[in-house]
Swiss-Prot record:
It is found in: Membrane. One of its GO terms (biological process) is defense response. It comes from Linum usitatissimum (Flax). May be involved in modulation of pathogen defense and leaf cell death. It is a multi-pass membrane protein. This is MLO-like protein.
Length: 217
């Protein structure tokens, strides 16, 4: 701790003022500022959250392509950081002699894309936010509607959200046979095709069942 504190005090404070400098308070204040940047949710992240909700639409097969976006970003960012470490190592090798007390490496903005280190931080922040948002959405939908609903019609959706593979017993799935045309429910006329993938409450018995498919006789 003393070895980490002394260079900061020597570089930023006048000689003789070390006793009046509260290093712990300085570190706490710095961490609070960094915490706001790393954990804070910007309007851009909320915009991507809305796009995630809109992509969860029937027919878009989001479970096939959406999980690969954070994965590709993490692989690209990790590769870039590894390249930066390699470049810094080569720069030390090219320097030859090392002067005692001088910084061994000299990182700069030119090592990052477009000279913007914050772009890498934003991409990491984006992946963390998207993973947390998808997991929160999965937990909320299970809590509100249960595991066997139209939100989790595909097993891939559950695997994408939480890594859990449900054991769905098809023999226990309740089915219903509807006559061709319209289904009258509580003074509402609905096309039977619109009921696929929905949880329906029977008007005569009050029982709830999941409409997996429709068969016309």
């Amino acid at each position: 701790r003393i070895r980490a504190r002394y260079p900061i005090i020597a570089a930023h404070l006048a000689p003789g003022s070390e006793s009046r400098f509260d290093f712990q308070k300085y570190v706490n204040r710095s961490l609070e500022d960094d915490f706001k940047v790393v954990v804070g949710i910007s309007p851009i992240l909320w915009f991507f959250a809305v796009l995630f909700l809109l992509s969860n639409t029937h027919g878009w097969v989001a479970y096939l392509w959406l999980p690969f976006i954070p994965l590709i970003i993490i692989l690209v960012v990790g590769t870039k950081l590894q390249v930066i470490i390699t470049q810094l190592g080569l720069s030390i090798q090219d320097r030859g002699d090392v002067v005692k007390g001088a910084p061994v490496v000299q990182p700069g903005d030119d090592l990052f894309w477009f000279g913007r280190p914050r772009l890498v931080l934003f991409l990491i922040h984006f992946c963390l936010f998207q993973n947390a948002f998808q997991l929160a959405f999965f937990i909320w939908s299970v809590y509100e509607f249960g595991i066997k609903t139209c939100f989790h019609e595909k097993t891939e959706d559950i695997v994408r959200a939480s890594g859990l593979v449900p054991n769905r017993d098809t023999s226990a799935t309740q089915t219903t046979e509807l006559s061709k045309g319209k289904l009258m429910m509580a003074d509402t006329c609905l096309p039977t095709e619109d009921l696929v993938g929905m949880v329906v409450t029977a008007a005569h018995s009050g029982k709830r069942f999941f409409v997996d498919s429709i068969r016309y006789d």
